[in-house]
């Protein structure tokens, strides 16, 4: 399995289009622009579509996204060999741990404790080779 198969993870509020936090391995500006466009499209269509698992595929990478109530969207970019089951397991774990609720009231973004908890979880799943 490729090192660091999870390339990018974004948590955002799809009702406002605000990014709450992100986790990223090396991502170039072109890929980051692509991710932001995908998130913007998700925000336009996410209303009322809760807990629907979605996938966008390409030759080498896949995007997975899902929105939970009230309007927290997770967008994950992984290499195309990374198991879909593990992507949604990671998202469920982040959601269960209530990481999106760890908000800094001034910035309206996830606080440092939440960012560290997210980083720790992603690193576990980076190395997870369970099939």
Residue map of PLM features:
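Generic short beta-strand
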Residues: 9-11
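Acidic, low-complexity cytosolic segments
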Residues: 2-6, 15-131
């Amino acid at each position: 399995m490729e090192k660091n198969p999870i390339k990018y993870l974004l948590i955002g509020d799809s009702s406002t289009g605000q990014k709450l936090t992100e986790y990223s391995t090396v991502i170039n500006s072109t890929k980051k622009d692509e991710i932001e466009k995908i998130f913007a499209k998700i925000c336009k269509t996410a209303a009322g579509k809760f807990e629907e698992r979605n996938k966008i595929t390409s030759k080498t990478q896949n995007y997975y996204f899902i929105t939970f109530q009230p309007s927290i969207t997770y967008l994950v970019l992984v290499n195309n060999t990374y198991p879909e089951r593990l992507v949604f397991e990671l998202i469920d774990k982040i959601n269960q741990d209530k990481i999106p609720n760890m908000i800094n009231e001034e910035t309206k973004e996830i606080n440092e404790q939440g960012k560290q908890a997210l980083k720790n979880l992603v690193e576990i799943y980076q190395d997870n080779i369970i099939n």
